[in-house]
Design a protein with these regions (language model features):
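Class I S-adenosyl-L-methionine
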Residues: 1-79, 93, 190, 245-252, 359-391, 405-408, 413-425, ...
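Active-site-adjacent bridging/hinge elements
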Residues: 16-37, 70-77, 157-164, 192-204, ...
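Class I S-adenosyl-L-methionine-dependent methyltransferase module
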Residues: 37-40, 44, 53-185
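Signature of N6-adenine DNA methyltransferases within the class I
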Residues: 55, 62, 89, 94, ...
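Sequence-specific dsDNA recognition surfaces
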Residues: 204-208, 416-444
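Short Ser/Thr-interspersed hydrophobic loop/turn segments at strand-loop and sheet-helix junctions
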Residues: 446-464, 473-475, 492-506
Length: 536
């Protein structure tokens, strides 16, 4: 909101009072906005909840009105009736948000509630209801602000005043108006619900209407807020930061990179909130792309604990050379396979991605099996008798005779180069018992018994890749890489254990999960036949 107003009125001093305001690095490239009154600036919260965001927006609007010389007794009414808009699926929450705004008005003007009563002032906050007579809002309590309303539908909407449904029609008209107009600023903390947890009608609607972001509801709201925003307006969010890296949300990243502009983004430490480990970022998007513009980024990944997040953010805003403040042209993200928002990547890293082929072009990477019940089929190697254990099999033929226990790679603790050979699996008769178990999932069997590299799926420390000789099978937690010969495999082991690959992997996916799809995208310069003999 402060940014929008500073573009309308460049002489404003309001942004100087906003301690977390980040002045865009590309400000000179922004097209001058049409001059308009502060009364015309519209702010929308599509998932209002109890009104925390609207309450903060009220304070910023108040500063602007004061600076413009408005009568202090008139400002609360103007903000509530002209500037702030919100809606929620929960009636109680929307009522509480309305109450919060009225109390904000009372805080600024002790006679405000008297004005509310005499003028019948109502905040522009509504709640979703299911309206059986209107197909668009039949499942409104499930779909909420994801419902799309176009201007033609809004124009053609008629309230039949003599109808028995006149009052209900007035209520649905409010929702059409809220979702049919466009706003200068749209800000929200959207619901976080993965597709597997969405209820039927919501899941069906999201898959049909927002296919690019169907994997998580918060990602769908990122797009929806941009739709609700004026061209060149700003949207603001607090969401998980996995949209920046997950392969399932690559299409969302492509849309943002091509059509919009990441204005600024703060990536919090995963311990940034008391009592919870959450991967959160807060960011703003401009509803317009500006060629060669650089967004501003603050990376708090190295600062543990909630007590560090705000101070380190303020330090970065004041001192751009602090080491955790970055500016980046989002066009460079397109040069990295998967389009991750790798804003801290150096020019050398970007060049490495753009000039070399990814690992998937040279090697096969595969996710392993799920036994379905490890306690039933898996043992530590020393728990089994040696006479029916075999660690050097080329194939499963001998398991039809005496061999029962064979090596089983299932990740394990952080270890580089070699190791974590702790487990064996009952593979008697080519895994007959495991394969017949109802909950098992046998994947990529063609790679079983081959020499390979493997790593642990989840790690709270560092990425470590290990070499394994032929003779075993592998687990989903021990995804593996296969190559045509041992020399090439060892060369790749050296590459993946290098600092440069670790840096590349952190850009592709800086979470605790190292998935097959992440390693696929690491680039390799395959112009030499030299072997990293140190890996032996």
């Amino acid at each position: 909101l402060g940014q929008i107003w500073s573009e309308i009125n460049p002489e404003t001093k309001v942004t100087a009072d906003l301690e977390f305001y980040i002045k865009p690095a590309y400000l000179e490239q922004v097209q001058k906005r049409e001059v308009k009154s502060i009364e015309e600036v519209k702010f929308f919260e599509p998932c209002t909840g109890s009104g925390h965001i609207l309450a903060y927006a009220f304070d910023v609007f108040y500063k602007i009105y004061e600076e413009q010389g408005y009568n202090p007794t008139e400002i609360p009414e103007l903000i509530i009736t002209k500037n702030l808009f919100g809606v929620d699926i929960d009636q109680r929450a929307s009522q509480l948000a309305s109450f919060v705004l009225l109390m904000k008005g009372r805080q600024r003007n002790r006679r405000f509630l008297r004005t509310v009563e005499t003028k019948n002032i109502q905040p522009n906050i509504s709640f979703y209801q299911d309206f059986e007579f209107d197909n668009k809002f039949k499942n409104a309590t499930a779909l909420g602000s994801l419902i799309r309303v176009d201007t033609l539908e809004l124009k053609n909407l008629v309230v039949e005043k003599n109808s028995l449904f006149a009052e209900r029609q007035e209520e649905v008209k409010k929702l059409y108006q809220l979702l049919g107009q466009r706003y200068d600023v749209v800000v929200t903390n959207p619901p976080y619900i993965s597709s597997s947890r969405m209820e039927g009608s919501l899941k069906q609607y999201v898959e049909a209407t927002y296919p690019e972001t169907k994997s998580d509801l918060y990602a769908t709201f990122i797009l929806r807020c941009l739709e609700l925003c004026n061209e060149n307006g700003l949207t603001g969010y607090m969401t998980p930061f996995n949209w920046m890296f997950l392969s399932t949300l690559e299409e969302l990243r492509k849309i943002i990179i091509k059509k919009h502009l990441i204005n600024n983004l703060i990536q919090l430490h995963n311990s940034g909130f008391d009592g919870a480990t959450v991967f959160i970022c807060t960011f703003t998007l401009r509803n317009k792309n500006i060629n060669d513009a650089k967004g501003s980024y603050i990376r708090l990944s190295d600062f543990n604990g909630p007590q560090n997040q705000a101070p380190k953010t303020l330090e970065a805003i004041k001192n751009k050379n602090c080491g955790w403040f970055y500016t980046s042209n989002q066009g460079s993200f397109e040069k990295i396979s998967g389009n991750p928002i790798g804003y801290w990547a150096t020019e050398k890293i970007i060049k490495m991605f753009s000039e070399n082929k990814s690992l998937e072009n040279f090697a096969s990477l595969a996710k392993g099996m799920d036994s379905g019940k490890n306690d039933l089929f898996i043992r530590l190697w020393y728990e089994c008798e040696s006479h029916n254990s075999n660690y050097k099999l080329d194939n499963s033929s001998s398991t039809f005779n005496n061999d029962k226990w064979i090596p089983y790679r299932k990740g394990g603790e952080f270890r580089k180069w070699f190791g974590n050979n702790d487990y064996v699996i009952n593979w008697k008769n080519n895994g007959e018992l495991v394969k017949s178990f109802s909950n098992s999932n046998i994947r990529n069997e063609r790679f079983y018994f081959q020499q390979c590299l493997s790593w642990t799926l989840l790690s709270s420390s560092f990425f470590g890749v290990r070499y394994y000789e032929k003779g075993g099978v592998f687990d989903a937690n021990g995804s593996s890489l296969f190559y045509e010969n041992e020399e090439g495999l060892l060369q790749i082991l050296g590459l993946l254990s290098s600092k440069i690959s670790i840096k590349a992997l952190q850009i592709i996916n800086p979470t605790l999960a190292f998935q097959k799809g992440n390693l696929d995208k690491i680039t390799i310069n395959k112009t030499t036949n030299s072997i990293n003999k140190g890996c032996k």
